[in-house]
Amino acid sequence: MKALGAVLLALLLFGRPGRGQTQQEEEEEDEDHGPDDYDEEDEDEVEEEETNRLPGGRSRVLLRCYTCKSLPRDERCNLTQNCSHGQTCTTLIAHGNTESGLLTTHSTWCTDSCQPITKTVEGTQVTMTCCQSSLCNVPPWQSSRVQDPTGKGAGGPRGSSETVGAALLLNLLAGLGAMGARRP
């Protein structure tokens, strides 16, 4: 019941969801079902970047991001998507208590606008991070790169309330589904 209260509070605080929701996955060819080793893919990206340069050395390469919804902490996202021009990669991490213990989920997607933020609503901490390099939106516990532990990045603790609200709602609903399956 506490999670339902958090969902209602998130709706009141953030207004109606809309902008920044996860994008529909593009064609199956964008999916990545291979092992965690991306060496071959990295070589393809370098070749693609070289062929997509505009006169003057400017690049028109589309950003590639992981795209998954509400995965538990121990699962990796293997789906990828080419973002539209001007989009960024986003990672949302939610830590909250459920009847069965601590639940951590992560969601990743392309979005038109992203500003890093960390908020706590009804005991659930939500952290959104943004990045602009290919396949950069992995949770910090799955990344070999050192990341800002606060999740604030250069943008500071501000963010689009619609984006955070929609993402928080998505993660809380996933948690409710996990709790509902275990009730007597």
Swiss-Prot record:
It is a lipid-anchor; GPI-anchor. Glycans are attached at residue 78. Changing residue 115 to P: In HLPP1D; a patient with chylomicronemia; no effect on protein expression at the cell surface; loss of interaction with LPL; loss of interaction with chylomicrons; promotes formation of dimers and oligomers reducing number of monomers. Keywords: Cell membrane, Disease variant, Disulfide bond, Glycoprotein, GPI-anchor, Lipid-binding, Lipoprotein, Membrane, Signal, Sulfation, Transport. Changing residue 92 to A: Only slightly increased formation of dimers and oligomers. No effect on number of monomers. Loss of LPL interaction. Its main location: membrane. Residues 63-148 form the UPAR/Ly6 domain. Residues 21-35 are annotated as: Disordered. This is Glycosylphosphatidylinositol-anchored high density lipoprotein-binding protein 1. It comes from Homo sapiens.
